[in-house]
Amino acid sequence: MGTATEKLSDATFKVADLSLAEWGRKEISVSEFEMPGLMAIRRKYAKEKPLAGVRITGSLHMTIQTAVLIETLVDLGASVRWASCNIFSTQDHAAAAIAKAGVPVFAWKGESLEEYWWCTLQAVTHPGGKGPQLVVDDGGDVTLLIHKGYELENGSDWVNTPSGSHEEKVIKDLLKQVHAEDPQRWHKMVAEWRGVSEETTTGVHRLYKMQEQGKLLVPAINVNDSVTKSKFDNLYGCRESLADGIKRATDVMVAGKVAVICGYGDVGKGSAHSLRGMGARVIVTEIDPINALQAAMEGFEVTTIEDTLGRGDIYVTCTGNCEIITLEHMRLMKDQAIVCNIGHFDNEIQMDRLNESDAKRLQIKPQVDMYTFPGGSSIFILAEGRLVNLGCATGHPSFVMSNSFANQTLAQLDLWKNKDTYKVGVYTLPKKLDEEVARLHLEKIGVKLTTLTPAQAEYLGVPVEGPYKPDHYRY
């Protein structure tokens, strides 16, 4: 399918097929009903329009649920430009509906890396060549691009150093091109940039690393570590969407299979329970003794990945780290083993080394590839090692994404409202807002809260209306 680059009023966009807009609009309407928290925030602030005229760039999976987030930001007054944060995660009917509504969106399923970073550049380029005042990021690619461009203008030689991957080379080539056209583009952009809210674990790691190195340029809100994000999206979202992605891609019977979950953080916990719930015999690999003990106490076998080779049928990486499954591991896997990733980036599996190896690649269907080694054994790689739940299915359900996106919207409101007082650093949303996000979702699922009496509140030393837990409390 060719992409469509067109104009609607003054909003340039690039999507796969604009004729899918009506289908997308129908699904957006259904999704709104399943996203009570986000819709409540929209109703609360739509008249006030606290983001009036604010230029927002989003880099986040262009799904039906994200469309509801985008239109919430627009209803709050923002001028929004959007790209997806993954080459396979766009739902083309969602992108078409948003483009038809007049929002500049640059996203389609199956982008090349060159196209992906071109889309990201378009998303940060607002009318008149201006940059974003706020950023909604997922994985930190917009934040990375702006910071690397800024450092290049300050004399950094990073763009001329050897690249560790094809994607890194693509980024460097793009930055060189931009620098040749406008040697001060990123400095002009940063002058008006007021903050970023980051969606996922991997992007948060990038933010903290930049902060430690003294390179972070703006205040950043770590949305990922809001309890109503990490303990819901990462855990319950993955519990439903991982199995969905594997089943849609392969139609394999999960029951009775040996599944190896690499990592037992919140995403790993959700993934392990996802496959155990379908009858798989689940093994967990971990580096952290606390997480390893948790997995063992849940009844999972915990061992090294090397000990699973030859008996694992399904491998899932969810660590946020690199080179978890190596080429050597894949050569030793059981014939027809399924290998996939539900961490943000594709470097958890050594995809570059696999593609450069002597293994022969055969595409079974989009996002499902069989690699056959010279000895005759084969493995299946799903979504080219990228997010399997979004590459091979439609990601998390709307209800759980309402939690995450309510947090994103509140973070954007907070960054703009307090733009003159925030200092450069990484922050989390206050506990009271975290509890409010949860509260907005209770009625939808029939929950009735118990109310503290004044005496009980005094006994606990908390307000009757909350917040009820200290910041260090582990849910």
UniProtKB/Swiss-Prot annotation:
Binds 1 NAD(+) per subunit. SMART domains: AdoHcyase, AdoHcyase_NAD. InterPro entries: Adenosylhomocyst_ase-like_sf (IPR042172), Adenosylhomocysteinase-like (IPR000043), Ado_hCys_hydrolase_NAD-bd (IPR015878), NAD(P)-bd_dom_sf (IPR036291), S-Ado-L-homoCys_hydrolase_CS (IPR020082). NAD(+) binds at residues 200-202, 234, 263-268, 286, 321, 342-344, 389. SUPFAM superfamilies: Formate/glycerate dehydrogenase catalytic domain-like, NAD(P)-binding Rossmann-fold domains. Pfam families: AdoHcyase, AdoHcyase_NAD. Its EC number is 3.13.2.1. It catalyses: S-adenosyl-L-homocysteine + H2O = L-homocysteine + adenosine. Substrate binds at residues 63, 138, 199, 229, 233. Keywords: Cytoplasm, Hydrolase, NAD, One-carbon metabolism. Its main location: cytoplasm. This is Adenosylhomocysteinase. The lineage of its organism: Bacteria, Pseudomonadati, Acidobacteriota, Terriglobia, Bryobacterales.
